[in-house]
Every structure is written in structure tokens, then in C-alpha cells.
From Swiss-Prot:
HAMAP family, per the entry: RuBisCO_L_type1
Sites annotated Transition state stabilizer: 327
The protein, known as: Ribulose bisphosphate carboxylase large chain 2
Record's subunit section: Heterohexadecamer of 8 large chains and 8 small chains.
Source organism per UniProt: Hydrogenovibrio marinus
InterPro entries to which the protein is assigned, alphabetical: RuBisCO, RuBisCO_lsu_C, RuBisCO_lsu_C_sf, RuBisCO_lsu_fd_N, RuBisCO_lsu_N_sf, RuBisCO_lsuI
Length: 471
């Protein structure tokens, strides 16, 4: 370093940050960006600009570069690939030394990788497609407070997906009527019920009143059915201090699970809450409100697989993932790719699922995938087949829209779920024989028969906006 000299002025980024001969280290954090450069900007220069601005670079040479080892700390754009079917975009693969990031801080990683660089003039659009977190970083993160197996043990539920429901209408109910709806759903056969993401503490329903009436409903349904029940009490609030106060009260009421809107509240709040849940034996359900603002544009933003990985590191026992078959956006292959990132201990590179890197999660517990949004009993065979046992299938309108009421809707979904699981275990093809399986089960369940008739014409057949870039 003593032999370095300072040459003032502006240099092309690719002279420093484009390193095609570099072989990434096991300890490097790897990123894949989809880049659309401005007209006239070479790919190598655009990739190097992204590497520079997301690591050590600035727009001009500065003399303080001489006071550190820039060769060690810089991000390196080491590979470029074409994007199938898009002549303007390309993939830029960038390696970052681990020492650029604070241990255990997803916040710090995102501040660098999706910070100022996304407003950079050298690129027309930029999307973070995937990250490879090194195991050395993963070991510094708390991860899920409980994880899949511990949750199953706490709730004593095995061998099938869990069955849930978001209470509707999402806004406007009094606390007492809200608690009544919870009781009817749980008493009818659901395992879990849920606050919607925008229920916090509004004038029509203050949080403390809701918590008390819901706790009464959960305890009553548990006692009457002999099954362990739960309700996701949303503790999201305007301040972290208020959020923690609500979490403490849920614990005082003896409730097993709370809920958090992790994107609107932020990763700092989420990690704080996850650490508290781990120390206090509480399960943590995570809603992804605001995700589509960030991830739906296929050319600019952050792919949800990255948000899912970050959530697993930050902490959560459940995460909403879309349904593939319901009312919300979700490509099947892509969804399966990030569901694997939530649940598996090792996920290999698989471009057919949008997975750009091998990802080793070590011994970090997994996260339950939550399928929710516009689903009903006719979707049950596909949902069981797509999401498997380590999931929560949540039917909001598909429970409470039943002509017989909440309890009847819950019973219909429980019968449908158990029929599908039984058929799967017997080797039947759920997606090919699903209709027959449900109709057979409906012969002995009036509630299911009515549900099948009610929703037989309901479909959400819209093309997926954010499709995988595969040929």
C-alpha cells in the first residue's frame, strides 16, 4: 500500500470492478442482478458500475483510497449472462467480501446492495434476482424463532398442512364480533385463524380489546375440540416500543403465536421481534404486505426469493408465499423455488425455478410456507400437491363465505384437506383426480357439498406478470 499513488479524476468502473477471471470464495456474498444499461453503456461498464456503487466505489477517484486495501474490499463483477428472450437486459454476477457487512444484519446487506445503486444513471433499470449468503454470515443470524418441527411439537399437528383463515371483513368488526368469528372458525375445524395485515389498533377495534376477545375464543375452541388452536395476533405498530408492548400482552394471555408485517415495519423491527419470540417461546407469523411494490416489476426492484431469504435470516416461523392457483400473482416454478429457500437446509442452483446459486442454510430451522389469497375448496388438491405438509393453507373468504357460516366453511375445508391427504398417501394423483376426490368426500359431508356447489365457477385465470426468464 505504501507504493500507491493518487491519480485524481474519473476512471471507467470496469478498470477496477470488472474482474472476469475472479473465482468467488466460499465466504463471499454473491448477487445476481438483472441490468438494463442506458443506451451506449457497455455491459461490462454497467456491471462494474453496479459492483462499485454497491460496495466501495464513488463517482471519482479519492485520495483516501490510499488509506485502505481497496483490492480486498471492493465488489467484483465476475460474470455476465444473457437474459433469455430479452435483448436489452443481462445478468450481472457480483461477489462481495464478507467483511463489507455487519454480522447478523440483513439491514446492512440490503442498504449496500439495494441502496443508492438503484438510482444510478448508468442503468435504466435494475433488479436483484438472487443472493447467495455464505454460511459464515448465516451463522451470525438468529433465523426463525422456533422453526417447523418445534411448531409442530407445540401445536401437536403432524402429517398434513395446517389449516387457517383470515378473519373477514378485514376492517370494521368490533372486538367482540371479531372474537366470535374466530371461535366459529376454530370450533368448526381450523387449526389457526389470523388478523389481516392492516388490523392494528383502529378506533373501531383497539388492539387490547381484540387480543382479549380472541384469547377467549381460542381457549374456548381448544377446550371444546381437544385440539391445540391459535390465532395470529398482529402486533405491528407505529413504534418498536408499542409493538413489543403488544407482544408482551399476547404472552400474558397465554397465546402461542403473534404476527408481524415485516416489510412495512422494517427488518430492524422484525429481527427485534423475532429475537424476543425466541427468548419467550412464541411463534411468529410473517405477512408480506408491500412486497408487490418491490418485487412485481420483472425489470426493476427485488425478486421475492431475495426477500424470502432475508426473512428467514431475520426471523419468522411462517411467511406468506402466494398460492399459484388463487387471486394473487405467483408463477408456479418460481414459487416452488423460494418455498424451497424457506424450508430446506440446502437448495441447489436450478434456473428452471429461478435459483441462481447453491444455498447452504446449515442448521438454521425452516419457515412454514403460507398459501393465502382467493382460494377455496376446489383448490385444495392442487394446494396440497404444490405446498406439501410443511405449509399453512389459509381460506379467508373460502371459509367465511360459506352459506352455512364460518363453522360450516371451516368444516368443509377440514374434510377437503383430510380427504386430499388421505388420497395422496394412498398414491392417487391429486391434481388429475382432485375433483373426484372432493366429490367422494362430499357424499358424507353436507358442508363440503355446499362449498363445492358455491364455488364451482370461481376461477382467477390471469397471466403471471413476473415470469421466470427461461426458454
Amino acid at each position: 500500500m505504501a507504493s500507491k499513488t493518487f491519480d485524481a479524476g474519473v476512471q471507467d468502473y470496469q478498470l477496477t470492478y470488472w474482474t472476469p477471471d475472479y473465482t468467488p470464495l466460499d465466504t463471499d456474498l454473491l448477487a445476481c442482478f438483472k441490468v438494463v444499461p442506458q443506451e451506449g453503456v457497455p455491459r461490462e461498464e454497467a456491471a462494474a458500475a453496479v459492483a462499485a456503487e454497491s460496495s466501495t466505489g464513488t463517482w471519482t477517484t479519492v485520495w483516501t483510497d490510499l488509506l485502505t486495501d481497496m483490492e480486498f474490499f471492493k465488489g467484483r463483477a465476475y460474470r455476465i449472462e444473457d437474459v433469455p428472450g430479452d435483448k436489452n437486459a443481462f445478468y450481472a454476477f457480483i461477489a462481495y467480501p464478507l467483511d463489507l457487512f455487519e454480522e447478523g444484519s440483513v439491514v446492512n446487506v440490503l442498504t449496500s446492495l439495494v441502496g443508492n445503486v438503484f438510482g444510478f444513471k448508468a442503468v435504466r433499470s435494475l433488479r436483484l434476482e438472487d443472493l447467495r449468503f455464505p454460511i459464515a454470515f448465516i451463522k451470525t443470524c438468529g433465523g426463525p424463532p422456533s422453526g417447523i418441527q418445534v411448531e409442530r411439537d407445540k401445536l401437536n399437528k403432524y402429517g398434513r398442512p395446517m389449516l387457517g383463515c383470515t378473519i373477514k371483513p378485514k376492517l370494521g368488526l368490533s372486538a367482540k364480533n371479531y372474537g366470535r368469528a374466530v371461535y366459529e372458525c376454530l370450533r368448526g375445524g381450523l387449526d389457526l385463524t389470523k388478523d389481516d395485515e392492516n388490523i392494528n389498533s383502529q378506533p373501531f377495534q383497539r388492539w387490547r380489546d381484540r387480543f382479549e376477545f380472541v384469547a377467549e375464543a381460542v381457549d374456548k375452541a381448544t377446550a371444546e375440540t381437544g385440539e391445540r388452536k391459535g390465532h395470529y395476533l398482529n402486533v405491528t405498530a407505529g413504534t418498536v416500543e408499542e409493538m413489543m408492548k403488544r407482544a408482551e400482552f399476547a404472552k400474558e394471555l397465554g397465546q402461542p403465536i403473534i404476527m408481524h408485517d415485516f416489510l412495512t415495519a422494517g427488518f430492524t423491527a422484525n429481527t427485534t421481534l423475532a429475537n424476543w419470540c425466541r427468548e419467550n417461546g412464541m411463534l411468529l407469523h410473517i405477512h408480506r404486505a408491500m412486497h408487490a411494490v418491490i418485487d412485481r416489476n420483472p425489470l426493476h426492484g427485488i425478486h421475492f426469493r431475495v426477500l424470502a431469504k432475508c426473512l428467514r435470516l431475520s426471523g419468522g416461523d411462517h411467511l406468506h408465499t402466494g398460492t399459484v392457483v388463487g387471486k394473487l400473482e405467483g408463477d408456479r416454478a418460481s414459487t416452488l423455488g423460494f418455498v424451497d429457500q424457506l424450508r430446506e437446509s440446502f437448495v441447489p442452483e436450478d434456473r428452471s425455478r429461478g435459483v441462481f446459486f447453491d444455498q447452504d442454510w446449515g442448521s438454521m430451522p425452516g419457515v412454514m410456507a403460507v398459501a393465502s389469497g382467493g382460494i377455496h375448496v376446489w383448490h385444495m388438491p392442487a394446494l396440497v400437491n404444490i405446498f406439501g405438509d410443511d405449509s399453512v393453507l389459509q381460506f379467508g373468504g373460502g371459509t367465511q363465505g360459506h352459506p352455512g357460516g364460518n363453522a360450516a366453511g371451516a368444516a368443509a375445508n377440514r374434510v377437503a384437506l383430510e380427504a386430499c391427504v388421505k388420497a395422496r398417501n394412498e398414491g392417487r394423483d391429486l391434481e388429475r383426480e382432485g375433483g373426484d376426490i372432493l366429490r367422494e368426500a362430499a357424499r358424507t359431508s353436507k358442508e363440503l357439498a355446499v362449498a363445492l356447489e358455491t364455488w364451482k365457477e370461481i376461477k382467477f385465470e390471469f397471466d403471471t406478470v413476473d415470469k421466470l426468464d427461461v426458454q
